[in-house]
Amino acid sequence: MKLSELLDSQLIFTELESLEKELFLRKIISRISDVQSSIKESTVIDLILKREKLCSTGLDNFIAIPHAKIPGIDKTYISLCISNNGIDFGSIDGLKTKILILILNPEETGNHHLEILKSVSSLFTKKNVINQMLNIKNPEDIINFIKANE
Protein backbone atom coordinates (compact mmCIF):
# COMPACT_ATOMS: atom_id res chain seq x y z
CA MET A 1 0.00 0.00 0.00
CA LYS A 2 1.36 3.39 -1.00
CA LEU A 3 0.79 6.56 0.98
CA SER A 4 0.48 8.62 -2.21
CA GLU A 5 -2.58 6.60 -3.23
CA LEU A 6 -4.37 7.51 0.00
CA LEU A 7 -3.62 11.23 0.02
CA ASP A 8 -6.13 13.88 -1.00
CA SER A 9 -4.71 17.32 -1.81
CA GLN A 10 -7.65 18.91 0.05
CA LEU A 11 -6.35 17.31 3.26
CA ILE A 12 -2.77 18.55 2.91
CA PHE A 13 -2.05 21.68 4.90
CA THR A 14 1.26 23.54 4.66
CA GLU A 15 2.82 26.56 6.35
CA LEU A 16 0.80 26.00 9.52
CA GLU A 17 1.49 28.06 12.59
CA SER A 18 3.10 26.48 15.60
CA LEU A 19 0.53 25.85 18.34
CA GLU A 20 0.23 23.76 21.47
CA LYS A 21 -0.34 20.09 20.57
CA GLU A 22 -4.03 19.78 21.51
CA LEU A 23 -4.97 23.10 19.91
CA PHE A 24 -3.08 22.12 16.75
CA LEU A 25 -4.92 18.78 16.55
CA ARG A 26 -8.28 20.48 17.12
CA LYS A 27 -7.56 22.98 14.34
CA ILE A 28 -6.51 20.27 11.85
CA ILE A 29 -9.49 18.05 12.66
CA SER A 30 -11.81 21.03 12.22
CA ARG A 31 -10.32 21.68 8.77
CA ILE A 32 -10.73 18.02 7.83
CA SER A 33 -14.38 17.97 8.90
CA ASP A 34 -14.95 21.11 6.80
CA VAL A 35 -13.69 19.22 3.74
CA GLN A 36 -15.19 15.79 4.54
CA SER A 37 -18.73 16.01 5.90
CA SER A 38 -18.70 12.36 7.05
CA ILE A 39 -16.07 13.28 9.65
CA LYS A 40 -17.73 14.18 12.96
CA GLU A 41 -15.34 16.71 14.46
CA SER A 42 -16.13 16.13 18.16
CA THR A 43 -15.87 12.33 17.85
CA VAL A 44 -12.54 12.48 16.04
CA ILE A 45 -11.10 15.00 18.50
CA ASP A 46 -12.12 12.83 21.46
CA LEU A 47 -10.64 9.66 19.95
CA ILE A 48 -7.39 11.27 18.80
CA LEU A 49 -6.82 13.00 22.15
CA LYS A 50 -7.62 9.77 24.01
CA ARG A 51 -5.05 7.96 21.85
CA GLU A 52 -2.45 10.67 22.52
CA LYS A 53 -2.99 10.34 26.28
CA LEU A 54 -2.20 6.61 26.07
CA CYS A 55 1.09 7.27 24.34
CA SER A 56 2.34 10.17 22.25
CA THR A 57 2.46 9.48 18.52
CA GLY A 58 5.44 11.82 18.18
CA LEU A 59 8.26 9.79 16.66
CA ASP A 60 11.75 11.02 15.77
CA ASN A 61 13.03 13.06 12.82
CA PHE A 62 10.26 15.72 13.17
CA ILE A 63 7.42 13.23 12.52
CA ALA A 64 4.17 12.49 14.38
CA ILE A 65 1.49 10.03 13.27
CA PRO A 66 -1.66 10.50 15.34
CA HIS A 67 -4.23 7.88 14.38
CA ALA A 68 -7.51 6.33 15.48
CA LYS A 69 -10.34 4.09 14.33
CA ILE A 70 -13.39 6.26 13.77
CA PRO A 71 -17.01 5.05 13.90
CA GLY A 72 -19.24 6.06 11.01
CA ILE A 73 -16.64 6.50 8.28
CA ASP A 74 -16.34 4.06 5.40
CA LYS A 75 -12.85 4.80 4.14
CA THR A 76 -9.45 5.91 5.39
CA TYR A 77 -8.68 9.61 5.51
CA ILE A 78 -5.12 10.87 5.78
CA SER A 79 -4.16 14.46 6.40
CA LEU A 80 -0.56 15.58 5.97
CA CYS A 81 0.32 18.80 7.78
CA ILE A 82 3.53 20.82 7.75
CA SER A 83 4.58 23.31 10.42
CA ASN A 84 8.12 24.54 9.78
CA ASN A 85 8.45 25.93 13.32
CA GLY A 86 7.19 22.68 14.80
CA ILE A 87 4.84 21.53 17.54
CA ASP A 88 5.91 19.87 20.78
CA PHE A 89 4.45 16.37 20.39
CA GLY A 90 6.54 14.71 23.07
CA SER A 91 8.63 13.05 20.37
CA ILE A 92 11.06 10.34 21.42
CA ASP A 93 14.05 12.40 20.22
CA GLY A 94 12.83 15.58 21.95
CA LEU A 95 12.56 17.52 18.67
CA LYS A 96 9.44 19.40 17.66
CA THR A 97 7.15 17.78 15.09
CA LYS A 98 7.23 19.48 11.71
CA ILE A 99 5.41 16.87 9.62
CA LEU A 100 2.22 15.39 11.02
CA ILE A 101 0.36 12.57 9.31
CA LEU A 102 -3.12 12.19 10.80
CA ILE A 103 -4.72 8.83 9.94
CA LEU A 104 -8.44 8.20 10.42
CA ASN A 105 -9.50 4.62 9.75
CA PRO A 106 -12.97 3.03 9.75
CA GLU A 107 -13.60 0.87 12.81
CA GLU A 108 -13.81 -2.32 10.75
CA THR A 109 -10.43 -2.21 9.01
CA GLY A 110 -8.62 -5.03 10.76
CA ASN A 111 -4.87 -4.45 10.44
CA HIS A 112 -5.18 -2.05 7.48
CA HIS A 113 -3.88 0.78 9.67
CA LEU A 114 -0.67 -1.17 10.31
CA GLU A 115 0.05 -1.28 6.56
CA ILE A 116 -0.44 2.48 6.38
CA LEU A 117 1.83 3.08 9.38
CA LYS A 118 4.49 0.88 7.77
CA SER A 119 4.26 2.84 4.50
CA VAL A 120 4.52 6.17 6.32
CA SER A 121 7.41 5.11 8.52
CA SER A 122 9.43 3.66 5.64
CA LEU A 123 9.10 6.91 3.69
CA PHE A 124 9.95 9.20 6.58
CA THR A 125 12.99 7.31 7.84
CA LYS A 126 14.85 9.04 5.01
CA LYS A 127 16.18 12.34 6.42
CA ASN A 128 16.54 13.91 2.96
CA VAL A 129 12.83 13.25 2.27
CA ILE A 130 11.85 15.15 5.40
CA ASN A 131 14.14 18.10 4.68
CA GLN A 132 12.95 18.41 1.09
CA MET A 133 9.28 18.05 1.98
CA LEU A 134 9.50 20.94 4.45
CA ASN A 135 10.22 23.23 1.50
CA ILE A 136 7.24 22.15 -0.64
CA LYS A 137 4.20 24.39 -0.31
CA ASN A 138 1.77 23.05 -2.93
CA PRO A 139 -0.33 19.98 -1.93
CA GLU A 140 -0.19 18.41 -5.42
CA ASP A 141 3.60 18.83 -5.44
CA ILE A 142 3.76 17.07 -2.06
CA ILE A 143 1.80 14.10 -3.44
CA ASN A 144 4.07 13.92 -6.50
CA PHE A 145 7.16 14.15 -4.29
CA ILE A 146 5.89 11.29 -2.12
CA LYS A 147 5.13 9.17 -5.23
CA ALA A 148 8.69 9.70 -6.45
CA ASN A 149 10.17 8.65 -3.09
CA GLU A 150 8.02 5.66 -2.13
Where are these regions (language model features)?
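Cytosolic covalent-transfer regions centered on His/Cys nucleophiles
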Residues: M1-E150
